[in-house]
Design a protein with these regions (language model features):
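Cysteine-based protein phosphatase catalytic domain of the PTP/DSP
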Residues: 6-10, 15-97, 118-151
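A phosphate-binding catalytic loop at a beta-strand-loop-alpha-helix junction
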Residues: 96-114
Length: 152
């Protein structure tokens, strides 16, 4: 019988063996899933207060944390913040496949994945959004977040 807790932890490959997206890992079995999928690094876009990292995360993966605002705060991410996230992602990519997450993988982590597709793979913002919505159906960035993509 499958482990129900593990089956609820979703990991979607945006680009196979390059970039994956999903919600914050919260248990050791989530870390096992990341390792089983070949993930080498984790980029967190939420605060530790929003989603405390599970024990062992930093011992098992190369990790970076860059907190971006979401719908619960009074501002959109700034272009400089998105650029910082892309720089962190590029640095982590040198170690292998990267898992990008926020709390629920609806706004912030999809935004960074969209920006990666635009900047590193030459997709238009609309094409990147169409693609990401196919491979990661939970994608739901806010209009103000999407507007940043045109400024990359």
């Amino acid at each position: 019988m499958p482990d129900r807790g593990q089956s609820r932890f979703r990991l979607d490959w945006v680009l196979v063996q390059e970039l994956a997206v999903g919600p914050a890992p919260r248990a050791e079995r989530h870390l096992d899933r990341l390792a089983d999928e070949g993930v080498q690094a984790v980029l967190s876009l939420c605060s530790e207060a929003e989603a405390p990292p599970p024990p062992g995360l930093e011992a098992r993966f190369e990790c970076r944390r860059l907190v971006l605002p979401d719908h619960r705060v009074e501002r959109m991410p700034e272009l400089a913040e998105l650029e910082q996230a892309l720089a962190a992602l590029a640095e982590l990519r040198a170690t292998g496949p990267v898992f990008v997450h926020c709390v629920a993988a609806m706004e912030r982590s999809p935004l960074v994945c969209l920006a990666w597709l635009v900047r590193s793979h030459g997709l238009t913002p609309q094409r990147a959004l169409d693609y990401l919505m196919q491979v990661h159906p939970g994608t739901n960035p806010l209009p103000g977040q999407l507007a940043l993509l045109a400024r990359l």
